[in-house]
Amino acid sequence: MLERRIDLWLPTYLSQALDRRRERWRRRDTTTHVLFLVCDHFEPRHRAKEEGQPAQRVQRWREGYGELRSRCQHAFGHAPLHSWFYPPHHGYEHLFALAQYQFEGLGEIELHYHHDGDTSESLRKNLRAVLDEYHSWGLLLESGAPPKPCFGFIHGDWALDNSCNGKYCGVNDELTILQELGCWGDLTMPSANECQTRKVNSIYYAVDDPARPKSHDWGEDARVGQADPKGFFLMQGPLGINWRAPGYPRIENASITDENWGRPDRIQKWLDCNVHVRGRPEWVFVKLHTHGAVERDHDSLFGEKAFEMHRTLNQRFNDGKRFRLHYVTAREAYNIAKAAEHGHAGDPSAYRDFRIAPNATRYYLASAPHRLLQSTPMRVQLEVRDPAQRTRVRLRTPGFVELEAEFATLDVDSHGRTLRLGGCVPGSTGRVVLSPGVHAASVNGAQHSSQENHALALSVESHDVVVTLGS
């Protein structure tokens, strides 16, 4: 118990007991909407024994989680989502694979960051460099014209805002710096260790004080009618004492592991912790965390234990009357919380994109580093770093599915029904795949021939190639 630092959080937890009972009573005659999200401190190099093991873990997640989602979709009519908070010190070589996760709809990518001994200046400099690398794969960018830096955050070693007695951070104004760089909020807590805040089971705002550490130790609750309050947004997961745990009472800290998986008694406790925006108690947020890259915990995240957890969630908390279950990403949870602040009610899934639009790679996936100029449902523009490198781009813009070629610039405009490649290499070849039922009215700058599966084979003759669709 002492190693879980109950001295820091238990007084607040006990003081919330009456509120928890009161809010459950208020929800008895209405539908409780359960917003369920898993935030993964995703570290594929952790305790890797072989050189190729991190890449294998990343690929196993793509396959295994896709299989779990298919099973859940078939069994329950909807599928879970995952939020991978990826740390740069585990390698930029995995960013394309993570962008695939996002493009394929498995979930979304956010930032996990370990550091130590930083100053405000060094943290700004280092984070900007990290963000530039992620942006070159379309990650941590909000879709739009132009795309904007935008990310959720989990601090390494739980030490947000220098909260670990000077270790694993060093910066007292970290909340301010994160906001400056495009961070919409933090999802680090709970930790149930020395970094744990006195504030528990809350969605709230902390005002940064650069003169002292741990400014997020307390703050103002998010509440209906108080839109866009001052401070930095934080969303916590459930923390408390689970008296129904098998064998003996346990500390519930919202962590998913193979040993401590999503058992029915834990699921009930997550809801009982009652994390919500004040004034909207019927929208209950269940934010869990895990260190999911390591093989030992895969069963609890996309194996049989995971499926049993989702079976319990759907059987007990998705009857459509007393409860409705909504699987959300971290970004979507933030948007729904902001919608509650603005007074919205009813179906929270209507507000998944309320404040922050989907991530940029919702609409495209490029196989090479690039600078993204625009990413919307109807248009994608980018410049590749190395025009001599053959680049494959998958698309969700109407009319176009995929292209592969050597080029410097790409502009896919579904409104104008055109795909433009600039800086092409004459004499090279390329390929463009069109949507079913769509045909090319003209191709300028390249000879072309039709192939199977709605594809055009290109023999490039000019530096500029334009494919125009027929009406």
Spans of features found by a protein language model:
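Active-site-adjacent pocket scaffolds in enzyme catalytic domains
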Residues: 1-23, 139-282
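Active-site beta->alpha N-cap acidic-glycine motif
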Residues: 1-107, 115, 149-151, 157, ...
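C-terminal domain-boundary segment and adjacent tail
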Residues: 13, 180, 185-193, 197-199, ...
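Structural preference for beta-strand elements that scaffold enzyme active sites
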Residues: 35-39, 79-83, 106-110, 148-152, ...
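Well-ordered, non-membrane alpha-helical segments in soluble/globular domains
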Residues: 52-71, 94-95, 123-137, 167-177, ...
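Metal-dependent polysaccharide deacetylase catalytic core of the NodB/CE4 family, i.e.
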Residues: 85-165, 287-289, 329
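Surface-exposed beta-strand/loop patches in extracellular or lumenal glycoproteins
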Residues: 378-403, 422-438
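C-terminal beta-strand-rich structural cap/linker in extracellular carbohydrate-active enzymes
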Residues: 391-394, 401-404, 410, 452-471
